[in-house]
Amino acid sequence: MPSPPGLRALWLCAALCASRRAGGAPQPGPGPTACPAPCHCQEDGIMLSADCSELGLSAVPGDLDPLTAYLDLSMNNLTELQPGLFHHLRFLEELRLSGNHLSHIPGQAFSGLYSLKILMLQNNQLGGIPAEALWELPSLQSLRLDANLISLVPERSFEGLSSLRHLWLDDNALTEIPVRALNNLPALQAMTLALNRISHIPDYAFQNLTSLVVLHLHNNRIQHLGTHSFEGLHNLETLDLNYNKLQEFPVAIRTLGRLQELGFHNNNIKAIPEKAFMGNPLLQTIHFYDNPIQFVGRSAFQYLPKLHTLSLNGAMDIQEFPDLKGTTSLEILTLTRAGIRLLPSGMCQQLPRLRVLELSHNQIEELPSLHRCQKLEEIGLQHNRIWEIGADTFSQLSSLQALDLSWNAIRSIHPEAFSTLHSLVKLDLTDNQLTTLPLAGLGGLMHLKLKGNLALSQAFSKDSFPKLRILEVPYAYQCCPYGMCASFFKASGQWEAEDLHLDDEESSKRPLGLLARQAENHYDQDLDELQLEMEDSKPHPSVQCSPTPGPFKPCEYLFESWGIRLAVWAIVLLSVLCNGLVLLTVFAGGPVPLPPVKFVVGAIAGANTLTGISCGLLASVDALTFGQFSEYGARWETGLGCRATGFLAVLGSEASVLLLTLAAVQCSVSVSCVRAYGKSPSLGSVRAGVLGCLALAGLAAALPLASVGEYGASPLCLPYAPPEGQPAALGFTVALVMMNSFCFLVVAGAYIKLYCDLPRGDFEAVWDCAMVRHVAWLIFADGLLYCPVAFLSFASMLGLFPVTPEAVKSVLLVVLPLPACLNPLLYLLFNPHFRDDLRRLRPRAGDSGPLAYAAAGELEKSSCDSTQALVAFSDVDLILEASEAGRPPGLETYGFPSVTLISCQQPGAPRLEGSHCVEPEGNHFGNPQPSMDGELLLRAEGSTPAGGGLSGGGGFQPSGLAFASHV
């Protein structure tokens, strides 16, 4: 019987002869290469390629040329194949039937296809292997049966396919390895059984596949492997066990002596035993990431001379660096998220070709000398516990280009540590504890990261880094040398937006290969490198330095305008001097004991003094650093002076608001208490309230010292975050604003209630109208000035509209402390108590002084609604004459409290009951009576006399701290 090539030749001759008319000349026309009507054909010599795909065919064209070598019927609507349909296509080498609706193929469907080498039946609905049909294909080399519904492969399915080299059975419903069926494929070189439901691989499953080179078993449910599962695979080079449920390391791979690429990532393997790859000396790549590996034998990776990539992530129990003896070709080593504490001193001797060393997220504390790893190009040591860099740690690494030491605890770096790194272009020292940075050897840097080193206030000139393009420093002041003025720098957030836009553009242009996950290489080109390339292409590349200076990070002046500077100094002088005068007159010249409201007003003056002192400290810093603030800005922000300034500012402002709230509530409560109980709250309770307010204000001021908020966020040392601050930094600011806003609401409610209660009774016995009016003025002024602060704070938090840093800075420097100087001015200019207290502080020139001053002072006081009558001048003269004619013996050493003069009236004049002047019915605030010049009632505020009086010719006889007299 002739061989297949012989048969092919015979059939070719027969086809050529049949194509001519018997005994005649060739006829004009399409000839033997006529193409079926719906298909597209292409000639290849005397052979024909017919493309009938995606035409919606429901049957195979019947007029196919016998010389067709390629036939594509994929993506049609074929549901069945008739026996003998392709019998005349003796020269057909490739037949594509994928993407149809074939559920069954009869036994004689492929009869006559002796030359067929490639048969594609994927993406159909086959429920089994068309074994009888395949027996007719002795030359078949590639068979695709993937993406069908095959659940069982009979023993004789591939019988007769002795030439088959490639077999696809993936994406089916197989539950076991078709061991017996595979025994008939001795020439098979590549097979995939992926995406099935296989749960176990028995021993000797592939023992007859001695020619197999590639085996894919990924995306199954494999939990166990037999010890001899891969026995007989003497030529296997690639084994894929990824995405399974393996519980143990596949020790069966030790029989694969020619294995070069091994993948078993995304399994449940927890340990890699000692000498795990002892039988695989030709291994080049191992992928086993995304496994819960907790233990790795120290000798697991020994004697793998061909291995060039090793990636091991998340093995938390690994505390010692693996012994890589004999693994001399390793180029990329990744051991992250493990527990490695120490690197062996001989590591570089074992790995002379190492180019990339990634040891991030470990517990390394000390580094050995890496000078023997002279081919190193990238080192990643971020997120470790390294505290020192020695002189020889990175010496002689002339090829090193990128060094990442971020998120460590590095305190010191030897001055010569980087001196030999001539190729270094990227250095990352973010979030360490550096105080200085040695510059030797860093002249070629293009990207330098130093953020998070709060103790590093060192200035970096342009001459230190002539090639620098991207600089990230702890403080914006260190960016000042890279711009001539504040306008040079971009507005806050502009660079960030451009970076994001650039990232979006480049990600769409970047090849897909760079976006795919590469377990062996985490150093794909990133945005920083892209920016470096773009900057190099510019004729005059500039340095992108962050964070950028601005109004809250000035380069030259803390106060950038003379208007703000003069306003701050005016606030300082007025607040300190005026509040000091208020404190002096209230506590040194006032009556004893002090009225409760007056005591609170004095406490407010003390709080305002603290605000003035804090503003004075800022003004002094501006004066001392005039024109060169960037040289001292970092030290000022991190120093004790800034924290003290912020503490005083918050303590003063919060105490002022809380004490003002207390004063308003005290006035309102006094009215209610007098009406209900006949007496007002005592001075002791008010003092307790003052202490509570001061304690609450002190707590608020101390929170930023405990890292709740921050005083050093800006050189103003206030916890109010600038507009570009992080949302987390705004939390403390918003809390303060909301608390103060609540206090002003309480104040408003208290005074509304107070004025509603005024017409309901006669409260002149406990009423000090001047102080109540003064508190009302304080509420109005302070509330009005606090509105811009609250508005800008909420606008920044909610993002209602963009707020310029200049506006925020002006409000914080001028508007926020303005009540500290306005409050005492209101007291000094409009409150009659100040003049009374000031007179008491003056030296007494004569005996009549105290009484005269008391009487004159009471004349200057006016009532809330003009119902408290003024004392007639004749009565004052009477008192003055009496004091000059005969001086009582005890009057010289007696200190009188402030005196309220109330006229006793006729008819229906008030009667004296004890120490109170009681009006008859119908005589209230709105119904005054004519006064009598000869009768006066002198009564001390807030005190009750025991008795006694002033007779016509006698002297004063005071009792206790108060006196009453009826003339």
UniProtKB/Swiss-Prot annotation:
Gene3D superfamilies: Rhodopsin 7-helix transmembrane proteins, Ribonuclease Inhibitor. The keyword Repeat applies. Belongs to the G-protein coupled receptor 1 family. Disulfide bonds join 642-717. Glycans are attached at residues 77, 208. InterPro entries: GPCR_Rhodpsn, Gphrmn_rcpt_fam, Leu-rich_rpt, Leu-rich_rpt_typical-subtyp, LRR_dom_sf, LRRNT. It comes from Homo sapiens (Human). Pfam families: LRR_8. Residues 1-24 form the signal peptide. It is found in: Cell membrane. This is Leucine-rich repeat-containing G-protein coupled receptor 6. The chain crosses the membrane at residues 568-588, 599-619, 645-665, 688-708, 728-748, 775-795, 810-830. Residues 589-598, 666-687, 749-774, 831-967 are cytoplasmic. LRR repeats lie at residues 91-112, 115-136, 139-160, 163-186, 187-208, 211-232, 235-256, 258-279, 282-303, 306-328, 329-350, 353-374, 375-396, 399-420, 423-443. The lineage of its organism: Eukaryota, Metazoa, Chordata, Craniata, Vertebrata. One of its GO terms (molecular function) is transmembrane signaling receptor activity. It is a multi-pass membrane protein.
